[in-house]
Amino acid sequence: MEDNKLEPAEIVRSEMGTWTHPVYSKYMNEHLENEEYVSREEWEKFKSHFGVDTVVFWMESLVNSDDWEIMMDDCDITKWGPIAPNGFFLIDINFSEDDAYAIFARNK
């Protein structure tokens, strides 16, 4: 896979239910290794670099509050299966400080 090409990859989620696309992970490690968060400007650079559109889903807005609380308390999102919008593919499913999220991308 080319360094500036982001394409669907095999998803093998961890025991906690997390997964990160290897090309996305490499880019973030090389460009934002010591950052606590990604600024809007840096996110736009990422999207431009790969020529993609992205969408982020937050688990709290997609599951009932009881399920959300159980999954967050257990640090286990294996039961959460967000569905990619048409033409999008998963690049990251993980935890933030306050929620879990799934990031999807599609090539422009």
Q: Which residues make up each language-model segment?
A:
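Short, compact, well-ordered microdomains
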Residues: 74-108
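N-terminal "domain-start" segment
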Residues: 1-65, 69-78
